[in-house]
């Protein structure tokens, strides 16, 4: 007989809710464990089978840790601001708040149906004014510290969506949502100075237990590079520009310079003959995103300005070009080109037939670029030096002649923090008619997002908030001065930067988080989520955390001690699940047909947690069959406990049981859930063959399966006679001595050749080993004299006979 999953799951979910089984107390003597999931964006589509994979992993850990005596913080909430809700509201005329609330209710019900052990009293929602009051408070702190500032920035403007998009929201020059054209235009934007934390964000990665590949992605994004700035005068004018280079040693090999099309000097230095071509090129570039412009594989394009720069080291005149691969926002917006020794410069020079000059020996620049090390040539005072020596000497020369200086730069840009949308946190700043700007006072927070029917983009580049006169226009009660509220809103990243702190103290109206509580719970012990957030979310959260550390709000330098990215669950055809392909699997259907325990077990058994694996109905059926076998082993058809279960010990299962406890305990802790489940399957096979099942082993097994399949775990626990939940029962332990084999295989050799293999007690004495060995090879030594017997206890017996 199989178990009735619908009945059992409903029963235990009701029990947990009624008894607040997973409520986390703050005051406790127990050690702490904080298991965090990346909270979901509550989309209209609801939960998909990819969500529960990470959630089940943290849930298994949380449930095991509770049984091991830890006080576990395992919360859930909603990252609910953002573009999709606003887009839905624009398309349907409904309010984004209603849409979001409806979706959250759907998500919450779906998540509860999967039996996760969340403390729902700590639920947070980034769109709740009691929550975003503190998001705004953090913004005020950034503003006070000079880390939030306004700047004119060329942005990706999408006229159809009426908003600015981040580089990540653009694919092939079109918006990711809706595929609308995107163009570049300068706009007043709020920026956060994440670059001020570049070194700390880089150095502190070393202390974290994160996958190395993920740390490397962050290192590359921060992109620290050491080199020099070099100043170039523009021939025939008083103007000059500066370039940054990691290879100042190749300055003698520079044959031209390139400015970004947006560089401030371009209009000024372009000659009359080149004006038309330069302007046409600049207009064409406006349509491209930074990512497209810097694509390595793309065809090089550019235009000569007609102007020349003077190389400070030898007085040579170098033609100045503009090209889209140089970005105004990166470095200085200008580069010196050394085509003989730089790949990109070489390609550009080849396309436009520009000269090349060898200054480092080792290659043949008539055939290809040479980027390796070697002795310098054609370089006056650098001749004969290698790369490191030449860099040091050139920097010395640049500084002595005031032609340049040593410099460290970052690929990391400051964080563009404003969005021209309605559905986000209002930025608590007022712009006054006299040109000054002040922050809203702390006691006036939260600055609540006003309700409005009209959330169409203003079309001017401002957010829809600009349309709400009674909200936007303010008067200073003391001076009578008129002002306008900031109409930009914060990006979706803002609320997700600090939510892990609010779970610690979700109802505090006086402070972001109580200092004692935050000391108790930080850092997060394990954070599990998708790899798509590897760079931005984690970098932004680490940045905010460091700012909060600097102002004494948090006691740790880093928020997340251990981080793990789960893999992706693909469709049965190995393609990404998507509505358009029609291969999305809805967890509600699986919960109805197979049960939540089966879904949880299957997703953990599919393969390693970080692998991307195709969904399989057969695999799902197999997971259900295993749970049915477990049920049938312990429960009779009449619903009573199996008569095989007894209080007497059973030697034949002893080793298998202790092995299982050891492997499952270690594998759960290391997130190797698939191999832990395999081991439990092996144990169940052995248990079916056994005549009797010691009660201790049955209880231990039920405790081990419960974190993966909690409903069946609770039901079996109650059948074993317990009235309390299994949640806080103590985790089974294993005895190392029971894992050791009682018997060993002994090799018997005659004159060094193997003649027999014997099984005997591992404690057999030398005399016993010798006696048994001689009996076993009697026929081999007949008629010979035994000269010597060498015995290695527990291993072998070698007989010397002739």
UniProtKB/Swiss-Prot annotation:
It catalyses: tRNA(Leu) + L-leucine + ATP = L-leucyl-tRNA(Leu) + AMP + diphosphate. A motif ('HIGH' region) lies at residues 40-51. Transmembrane segments: none annotated. Pfam families: Anticodon_1 (PF08264), tRNA-synt_1 (PF00133), tRNA-synt_1_2 (PF13603), tRNA-synt_1g (PF09334). ATP binds at residue 579. GO terms for molecular function: aminoacyl-tRNA deacylase activity; ATP binding; leucine-tRNA ligase activity. It is found in: Cytoplasm. One of its GO terms (cellular component) is cytosol. A motif ('KMSKS' region) lies at residues 576-580. This is Leucine--tRNA ligase. It comes from Bacillus cereus (strain ATCC 14579 / DSM 31 / CCUG 7414 / JCM 2152 / NBRC 15305 / NCIMB 9373 / NCTC 2599 / NRRL B-3711).
């Amino acid at each position: 007989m199989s178990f009735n999953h619908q009945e059992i799951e409903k029963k235990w979910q009701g029990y947990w809710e009624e008894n607040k089984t997973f409520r986390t107390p703050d005051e406790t003597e127990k050690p702490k464990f904080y298991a965090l999931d990346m909270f979901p964006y509550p989309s209209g589509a609801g939960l998909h089978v990819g969500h529960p994979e990470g959630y089940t992993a943290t849930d298994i850990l949380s449930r095991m840790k509770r049984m091991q005596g830890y006080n576990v913080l395992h919360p859930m909430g909603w990252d609910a601001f953002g573009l999709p809700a606003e887009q839905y509201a624009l398309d349907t005329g409904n309010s984004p708040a209603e849409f979001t609330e409806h979706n959250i209710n759907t998500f919450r019900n779906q998540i509860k149906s999967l039996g996760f052990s969340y403390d729902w009293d700590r639920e947070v929602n980034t769109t709740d004014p009691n929550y975003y009051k503190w998001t705004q408070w953090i913004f005020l702190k950034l503003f006070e510290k000079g880390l939030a500032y306004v700047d004119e920035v060329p942005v990706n403007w999408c006229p159809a969506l009426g908003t600015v998009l981040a580089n990540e929201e653009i694919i092939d020059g079109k918006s990711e949502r809706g595929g609308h054209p995107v163009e570049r235009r300068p706009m007043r934007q709020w920026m956060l100075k994440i670059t001020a934390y570049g070194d700390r964000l880089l150095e502190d990665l070393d202390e974290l237990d994160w996958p190395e590949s993920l740390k490397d992605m962050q290192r590359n994004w921060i992109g620290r590079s050491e080199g020099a700035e070099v100043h170039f005068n523009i021939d025939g004018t008083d103007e000059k520009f500066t370039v940054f280079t990691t290879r100042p040693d190749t300055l003698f090999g520079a044959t031209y310079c390139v400015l970004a099309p947006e560089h401030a000097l371009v209009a000024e230095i372009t000659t009359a003959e080149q004006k038309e071509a330069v302007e046409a090129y600049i207009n064409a570039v406006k349509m491209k995103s930074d990512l497209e412009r810097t694509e390595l594989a793309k065809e090089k394009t550019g235009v000569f300005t007609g102007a020349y720069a003077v190389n400070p080291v030898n007085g040579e005149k170098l033609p100045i070009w503009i090209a889209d691969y140089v970005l105004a926002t990166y470095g200085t917006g200008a580069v010196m080109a050394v085509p003989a020794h730089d790949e990109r410069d070489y390609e550009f020079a080849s396309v436009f037939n520009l000269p090349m000059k060898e200054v480092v020996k080792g290659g043949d620049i008539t055939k290809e670029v040479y980027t390796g090390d070697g002795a310098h040539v054609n370089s006056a005072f650098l001749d004969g030096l290698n790369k490191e020596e030449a860099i040091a000497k050139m920097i010395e020369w640049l500084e002595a002649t005031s032609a340049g200086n040593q410099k460290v730069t970052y690929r990391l840009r400051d964080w563009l923090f404003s969005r021209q949308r309605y559905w986000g946190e209002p930025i608590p700043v007022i712009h006054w008619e006299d040109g000054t700007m002040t922050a809203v006072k702390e006691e006036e927070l939260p600055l609540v997002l006003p309700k409005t029917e009209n959330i169409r983009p203003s079309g001017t580049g401002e957010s829809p908030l600009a349309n709400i006169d009674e909200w936007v226009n303010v008067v200073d009660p003391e001076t009578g001065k008129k002002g306008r509220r900031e109409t930009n809103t914060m990006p979706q990243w803002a609320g997700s930067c600090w939510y892990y702190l609010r779970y610690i103290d979700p109802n505090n109206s006086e402070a972001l988080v109580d200092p004692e509580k935050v000391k108790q719970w930080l850092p997060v012990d394990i954070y599990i989520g998708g790899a798509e957030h590897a760079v931005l979310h984690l970098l932004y959260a680490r940045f905010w955390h460091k700012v909060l550390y600097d102002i004494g709000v948090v006691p740790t330098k880093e928020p997340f001690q251990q981080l793990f990215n789960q893999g992706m669950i693909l469709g049965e055809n190995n393609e990404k699940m998507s509505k358009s392909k029609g291969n999305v699997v809805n967890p509600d259907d699986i919960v109805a047909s197979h049960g939540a325990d089966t879904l949880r077990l299957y997703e953990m058994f599919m393969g390693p947690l970080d692998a991307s694996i195709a969904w399989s109905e057969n695999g799902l059926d197999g997971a259900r069959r295993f749970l049915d076998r477990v049920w049938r082993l312990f429960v009779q058809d009449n619903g009573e406990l199996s008569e095989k279960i007894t209080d007497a010990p059973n030697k034949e299962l002893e080793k298998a049981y202790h092995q299982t406890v050891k492997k499952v305990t270690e594998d759960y802790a290391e997130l190797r859930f698939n191999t832990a489940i395999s081991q439990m399957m092996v144990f169940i096979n052995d248990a079916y063959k056994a005549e009797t099942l010691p009660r201790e082993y049955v209880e231990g097994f039920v405790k081990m399966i419960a974190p993966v399949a909690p409903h069946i775990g609770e039901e079996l626990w109650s059948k074993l006679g317990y009235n309390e939940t299994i949640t806080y029962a103590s985790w089974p332990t294993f005895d190392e001595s029971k894992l050791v084999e009682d018997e060993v295989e002994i090799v018997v050799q005659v004159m060094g050749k193997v003649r027999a293999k014997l099984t005997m007690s591992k404690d057999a004495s030398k005399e016993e080993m010798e006696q048994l060995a001689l009996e076993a090879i009697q026929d081999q030594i007949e008629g010979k004299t035994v000269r010597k017997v060498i015995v290695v206890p527990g291993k072998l017996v070698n007989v010397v006979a002739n």
